[in-house]
Amino acid sequence: MKDSDQKTNNEELAAIAQRLKELRKAKGYSNYEHIAFALEMSRSAYWRLETGANFELKTLIKICRLLEVSLEEFFKDIKIPASKNEKP
């Protein structure tokens, strides 16, 4: 993976992490420990999500269900550019 691709991936993960944090607070979970408990996750596992760790889609779906947010709503303000790869 090119350095520029890695930078883009990190920026996208950071945007997703920020969105998680915003939605958590908007839904009344004052800190990450409370939502981690509700999700039956360890505090450290959830904390990694809010700090930009890569994670599985099924984890995001579980979080969205708890927060009563659709995936479409979750991603609405997150810009993920299309691939720049050329077709052969």
Q: Where do the model's predicted regions map?
A:
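Helix-turn-helix DNA-binding elements, focusing on the entry/boundary residues of the two helices
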Residues: 20, 31-32, 57-60
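A short, Lys/Arg-rich alpha-helix, primarily the initiator
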Residues: 1-27
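Short alpha-helical DNA-recognition segment
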Residues: 28-47
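Short, basic-rich loop-to-helix N-cap that marks the start of a DNA-contacting helix
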Residues: 52-65
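Short, charged recognition helix plus adjacent turn
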Residues: 1-11, 75-88
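Conserved hydrophobic/aromatic packing and binding residues within compact polymer-binding modules
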Residues: 20, 35, 46-49, 74
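DNA major-groove recognition helix of helix-turn-helix
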Residues: 49-50, 67, 75-78
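The alpha-helix within a helix-turn-helix
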Residues: 24, 36, 64
